Every structure is written in structure tokens, then in C-alpha cells.
Amino acid sequence: MSTSRQQQGRHQGHIARKRFGQNFLVDMGVIDSIVDVIRPQRGERMVEIGPGLGALTEPLIERLATPEAPLHAVELDRDLIGRLKTKFGDLLELHAGDALAFDFGSLAAPGDKASLRIVGNLPYNISSPLLFHLTAFAHCVIDQHFMLQNEVVERMVAEPGTKAFSRLSVMLQYRYVIDKQLDVPPEAFNPPPKVDSAIVRMIPYELHELPPVDERVLGELVTAAFSQRRKMLRNTLAAYRDSVDFEGLGFDLQRRAEDVPVAEYVRVAQIVAASKA
């Protein structure tokens, strides 16, 4: 790596590691705006994914953490873990490891009531798999606020009939109310990413609000539908025609996957699951 690139990627003596997808947030105005969107309250159960050098961690701790109710954080980079422990002490409980394998449910309060808030500047190279991993814990989550690549956020909030509407749109919109909150330019980071970023808010639907469906079946159906985006559903969903009376259901196969609302995918998945029972 050249000296100039090292300097650009160095912040507080730490060189950003590409394999961890590290881009450190450095713009204090942007940091303050993000914290205002999150609105942390004293004593809340909150976990930050990828705290990095603590740019967002510090104001979160100031607003909510106590030694009895610390901010939790999941961090993979062991060099950063030591720095964070030294800086924040017992106000931050660190969990060393990969967020893609972490059991976020272990941080929730006992019982059925949602109690956990999740925040983070997510590594862009694993953002989609991580969002899917988090759906397994939606039942115990109050809300999620993430910094993501703007293109990903646009897909998360996309409406049917638009090019941005995708498998990610369907699977996340089934489980969450999703709103884009804030645009973040590349120059807010060190090193600056090559893409624009945005803050997104995700609020899980309560279980009684969700139409009952086998999410594995829904995922398989949606994956098949979007497997060849330019083809009609009569081709991509051909394997389902024996188990689903699409015509009787009023489901038009002369459409592309991006034209079908979430509720229609859910209804077909319910029928597919029932046929396998």
C-alpha cells in the first residue's frame, strides 16, 4: 500500500482493513445527526454492530449507558477491541466475533416483549447477509438503525414496479416497516468509500401483525421469482404450477418478479406450504 493511501486510511493510529470493510465515520455533524435519529434513552438495551474506533459508540454511551446497563457491541477486529475496552471500560460490554454468527437474542430481556435496539455502521461487504441474519431475532427487537450503502437502502424501501424492487425488498418488507432517514456523503468517512451511504430505520412488525407464513418457503419462492429478473413469472415459477392454482388465485404470471407486491408473494407461499403439509 502506498504512503498516501495509508495516510488516507489511517484514523487515530489505526489503518482501516479492507477485509473487514472498515470505513470510519469521522464527520461530527453527521454523527450528531445519526444519534438524533436513534434517540437513545438511559438504561435501554442496545447493541452496536462494528463499533470501529468508537465514533458512534461514544455519544451512544453518553446518552444511555451505565455500569449496570452498558452498551453492548459486536466487533470482529481484535486490535480495535483492546482500544475500545481501554477507552470505555465498564460502560461498554464487548462481544468479540463475527456479527453474522452472533446470537443477538442472547442480549434481549427475558420474556416475549421486544426489548433490544440494534445500531451500526455495517460493513458494506456483508450488509445483505447480515440483514437476513438479523431477521431471526426480529421478535425481540424494538428497532434497528443502520448505516448502509445507499443502493442497498433504496432496494430495502423500493416499491413494486420499480427496478430497485428485489428479493431483499420482499423479504425485509414482510418483516419490518422500513424508512430511509438520512443521506451520508463519502467525505464523512476515512477512508471515503466509493459509494454514497444512508441511514435506514427498521421497525419489526409484531408477530400478531404478520400474516402467518413459513419464511423458508417464502424465501425459496422469492429467490426463484427473482432468479432471472427479465423473464416472466410463468418461467421462473414454473416449478410451482403443480401446487398452486395461479389462475384461480388471480395471480398473473404474465408479470416480472419486480411487479408483484409483498402480500401476493406471501399468499402464494402460504398455499405452497399448505400443499406440503
Curated annotation (Swiss-Prot):
Function: Specifically dimethylates two adjacent adenosines (A1518 and A1519) in the loop of a conserved hairpin near the 3'-end of 16S rRNA in the 30S particle. May play a critical role in biogenesis of 30S subunits.
Name of encoding gene: rsmA
GO-annotated cellular components: cytosol
Class of the enzyme per the UniProt entry, highest EC level: transferase
Compartments reported by the entry: Cytoplasm
Annotated catalysed reactions: adenosine(1518)/adenosine(1519) in 16S rRNA + 4 S-adenosyl-L-methionine = N(6)-dimethyladenosine(1518)/N(6)-dimethyladenosine(1519) in 16S rRNA + 4 S-adenosyl-L-homocysteine + 4 H(+)
Annotated S-adenosyl-L-methionine binding sites: 23, 25, 50, 75, 98, 121
Cross-referenced InterPro entries: KsgA/Erm (IPR001737), rRNA_Ade_diMease-like_C (IPR023165), rRNA_Ade_methylase_Trfase_N (IPR020598), rRNA_adenine_dimethylase (IPR011530), SAM-dependent_MTases_sf (IPR029063)
Keywords annotated in UniProt: Cytoplasm, Methyltransferase, RNA-binding, rRNA processing, S-adenosyl-L-methionine, Transferase
Protein name (Swiss-Prot/TrEMBL): Ribosomal RNA small subunit methyltransferase A
Protein family: Belongs to the class I-like SAM-binding methyltransferase superfamily. rRNA adenine N(6)-methyltransferase family. RsmA subfamily.
Enzyme Commission code: 2.1.1.182
Cited PANTHER family: DIMETHYLADENOSINE TRANSFERASE (PTHR11727), DIMETHYLADENOSINE TRANSFERASE-RELATED (PTHR11727:SF7)
Source organism superkingdom: Bacteria
GO molecular function annotation: 16S rRNA (adenine(1518)-N(6)/adenine(1519)-N(6))-dimethyltransferase activity; RNA binding
